[in-house]
């Protein structure tokens, strides 16, 4: 019987759930700490209650991650000390060192936003070098499909795992239930899955309702329990291409000038009048007129001495 139970446990799908953005709203985040301790928290290092919430979570035996702000491709307000691809290794080391000090007991890191940073291979190589010195794993939130995190970890001792499902892209409870069930199905099909959510009241309510009814073949685990699960590198070599910018004054050819007023129609009488005036004023007609009037004749011979 014991062997059967061990075999069943080995075949069970493993589901890991991480709650991001912790450290700003303790009154809401405390509800997360009432859930099973396998639910992990990712704490923003510069949040006002970062140290408090990390300490509370750790005291429960809960896994703590640093939720590191990283630069996105889109323009939006950024957290202080957001990692940028162009930063030097020393600057990235400094920021990560401060984050480790601000989030005690952290055993891993995941990215807050970060589509620009995680798609930069040189940038992520600097991050992995820093993480290796603190023996932290990296949970790739996969905010962009071409993340270079797994590729950047090659040659280091840093383990990389990947998010499969976002629970609460919307705060609609029905949508969150759909995403939770999707995470369960992926864990069952692939052997494991990581879902990321946020401490919204709607997310907390759905988890409170659905965790007690988790299927028997699904086991709730910490992210670090999945570090030896096989990971597929879906990235493309190189970093994300910068957006194409248009020149300030692109030449688009000469534009036709629009008449200020529509052209007036020309009637037949006016047409012949204009023709008559033009003919009468022509040089040839005036010449014949002058000849007819005698201006072109020779003068009479003089009669006197």
Please provide the spans of the model-predicted regions.
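Extracytoplasmic/secreted cell-surface and envelope-processing proteins
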Residues: 25-29, 49-53, 73-77, 117-122, ...
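Catalytic domains of cell-wall/extracellular-matrix polysaccharide-remodeling enzymes
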Residues: 89-180, 188, 192-193, 198-219, ...
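Glycine-rich, charge-decorated loop segments at or immediately adjacent to ligand/cofactor-binding or catalytic sites
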Residues: 53-56, 146-156, 230-238
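Substrate-binding cleft of extracellular glycoside hydrolase catalytic domains
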Residues: 55-105
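Active-site mouth loops of central-metabolism enzymes
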Residues: 15-19, 80-90, 169-174
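C-terminal domain-boundary segment and adjacent tail
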Residues: 133-143, 202-304
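Bacterial N-terminal signal peptides
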Residues: 1-6
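Active-site beta->alpha N-cap acidic-glycine motif
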Residues: 10-76
